[in-house]
Swiss-Prot record:
It holds the Pfam family Lactamase_B. It comes from Metallosphaera sedula (strain ATCC 51363 / DSM 5348 / JCM 9185 / NBRC 15509 / TH2). InterPro entries: Metallo-B-lactamas (IPR001279), RibonucZ/Hydroxyglut_hydro (IPR036866), UPF0173_UPF0282_UlaG_hydrolase (IPR050114), UPF0282_hydrls (IPR014426). The lineage of its organism: Archaea, Thermoproteota, Thermoprotei, Sulfolobales, Sulfolobaceae. NCBIfam families: PRK04286.1-1. HAMAP family: UPF0282 (MF_01406). Belongs to the UPF0282 family. This is UPF0282 protein Msed_0584. Signal peptide: none annotated. SUPFAM superfamilies: Metallo-hydrolase/oxidoreductase.
Amino acid sequence: MKIEPIAFESLGVRSQATLVETKDVRILIDPAVSLAPRRYGLPPHRIEVDTLVELAKKITEKAREADVLIVTHYHYDHHDPGYVVPKEIYRDKVVLVKNPESYINPSQGKVRAPKFLRAIKGLPKEISYADGKEYRFGNTRILVSHPVPHGADVRLGYVIQVFIKDGDSSVLFTSDVEGVPSEEHVKFTLDTKPNFLVIDGPLSYLVGRALTEDQLQVSVKNMERLAKSGLETMVVDHHVLRDLKYREVLSGLYDVAKSSGVKVTTAAEILGRETLQLEAKRRELFAQDNSPAKIPRNLASLLRIDQEG
């Protein structure tokens, strides 16, 4: 099994796009990418936009190679109706999506999910509401969790977690659980016992606004529990990498993982690259070069033309 992070905060954007390749099937999870519209009161920097364009192109290329595309929920860093990544990536694919009709908050259930499903209508070879289901492609098994809250409560909706097993190798993709804040989030990992875990980590940069200090500590403690559950590797990225002090936040996890023989890494590190954290460094970027930028309006069309060419 090959697990390849495509776009994450450590690579410079908001995303969790991940490619999993087994002997039987190529699976691309959450093929989307976005930027924080404001951070520290600042818009995206030119370097962030350039990085987004580069990674949107890579997602488009990887999607072209994939057999199965999975959408775990309807936030724009996890799904795209054709704004940044061309909707044509869904053509002739098996598409597994979060059920848009149950366990979903109003903004996703009434607006985003319907808009996305209308946008890709007629493109996929097959589309399936994946919540709580199991799929097989040759000897590869895809098990999807029942919906769990996007964080400590349900204000931001629900997500589905994805477990993929091929022989002795297995990976679990948590989606946006914000560092496993409850038993509901922990259970799927403990039940499936993956070798490899891709997890988003807590929203530590929003303590006092989106979560309390107590909730942050519970999330980290639960991540430490997972590190002792038989894992070999934990890719910890996405939400927690929006915090420049993420290593300090996760210090207990690093200690527990080391004593348990578990490798804790960012997406960038596992690819042998520098951890960028461009959003978290936005003030620094503007101090060095005052160059705000906007995502090109026709980016998805340009990428589609580029792929066709």
